[in-house]
Amino acid sequence: MAEGQAPAPPQPEGDQECMCTQDKVLQFLNKMADESGIKDLTDPALAEFLTDSDALKGIRDLFHYPKAGTLPDVDPTLVDPNADSIYLCGNSLGLMPKVTEEVMKEHLDKWAKMGVFGHMTGEVPWAHSDEHCLEGVGRLVGAKKEEVSIANSLTVNIHVLLTAFYKPTETRHKILLESKAFPSDHYAIESQIRLKGRTVEESMVCMEPREGEETLRTEDIIDYIENNGDEIAIVFFSGIQYYTGQLFDIKAITEAGHRKGCLVGWDLAHAFANVPLHLHWWDVDFAAWCSYKYGCTGAGSIAGLFVHERFLHDKRDRMLGWWSHKMSSRFTMDNVLDLDEGAAGYRISNPPIHCVAAMLGSLKIFDQVSLENLRSRSCYLTGYLEYLVKTLFGENSEQRTTKLSILIITPENFHQRGCQLSLKFSSPIDVIYPELVKRGVAVDKRYPNVIRVAPVHLYNNYVDVRRFISVLQEVAHIVEDHA
């Protein structure tokens, strides 16, 4: 380790593997049913027992959890407005940690009392505020401090990174990504290709799943790279696909890209603070993420980026601003760039303190519980949801009591998913979704016929999951009656 560099993060014990399986979930449910004396695994009373027995149940108290009556379009004749909502939408926007109010108030008070002097004074000087997040964020993504920066928004950071790393040549100019990537990623890549003088038709490759399948197979991605990698400049996938909820094998795909001389980057919007990441050890070249989903920093809050330490002293052309300049000489103002090293050199402007304060508040939660423990909890919560959906709504399930059936398009393999399950409905979601909302359910719909449901490891519990299923059963009968 070079002098002044941070130590490497701990090596992963099993790549990105989760030890959970459907059999283990079923064994767990049966064990808890035996302990409680509840025979039926779908009984709501079991959810109560599971929640009461959960060693991490107290984390929920660290968050503001919305009441049903505070959500829009809730019908008070159908649900108690004072009851907790069924908030399973943290894959879209995470809930607010209570400590965030305190941290933000500290900086609002500081602004009121100090004005401009807040930039350089206090426990967290604003000009250095992003640096106070680096250790915690580094732990969440498995990186050294100098490999991460807190800056901008996700799409801006994708542009920042692609501007620097996408250097097309006549023979190597393609960018490989998954089909139906999040629109902002798609547009960013299209625009970067055009800005570099190429055409989207020749340089953008959107990989499709096999016919009749919803998700990509890892072996198909690797085969494509091995067969076509000499033409690929950058492999750029989502860590977790926003629509299907598929967690890609980041390590294996990165290795495949490097074998063919490709740079490999990742959009970790749905992976950050959701699943353990080991970007340093997986040898990822660069990555970007937002923080307002599982990171719980608030809508549109500050994003992050990763640049591997192999580029620590790399001075490649990039988008620049005064925050790209080393702090030690930044305020000399001589207009001679002294480029900061590593990920810090990809910053552009000073950090917005209110967004950084939200990040500092969120990191206080992750200081209290490891992402590895949260991941284990997540597997059982999502596994419980999967069991209930398959048992009560599976197309071939004997226990299904409605015409409505649901197909889970998210991979069954726990190694290939995080908190989210994407549910594909046999009836139009435009009929189902409003009825869920009326009953205090917060999930989100994605056309043509998917509702995404995410029991978040930080603040959701088994009761939330079972209440959702109960509402879904009620709505299914209503849809049938009005068909």
From Swiss-Prot:
Subcellular location: Cytoplasm
InterPro entries assigned: Kynureninase (IPR010111), PyrdxlP-dep_Trfase (IPR015424), PyrdxlP-dep_Trfase_major (IPR015421), PyrdxlP-dep_Trfase_small (IPR015422)
Pfam families in UniProt: KYNU_C (PF22580)
Top-level division of the source organism's lineage: Eukaryota
SUPFAM superfamilies: PLP-dependent transferases (SSF53383)
Enzyme Commission number(s) from the entry: 3.7.1.3
Modified residues (N6-(pyridoxal phosphate)lysine): 293
Keywords: Cytoplasm, Hydrolase, Pyridine nucleotide biosynthesis, Pyridoxal phosphate
GO CC annotations, alphabetized: cytoplasm
HAMAP family the UniProt entry points to: Kynureninase
Functional note: Catalyzes the cleavage of L-kynurenine (L-Kyn) and L-3-hydroxykynurenine (L-3OHKyn) into anthranilic acid (AA) and 3-hydroxyanthranilic acid (3-OHAA), respectively.
NCBIfam families: kynureninase (TIGR01814)
Name by which UniProt lists this protein: Kynureninase
Organism of this sequence: Caenorhabditis briggsae
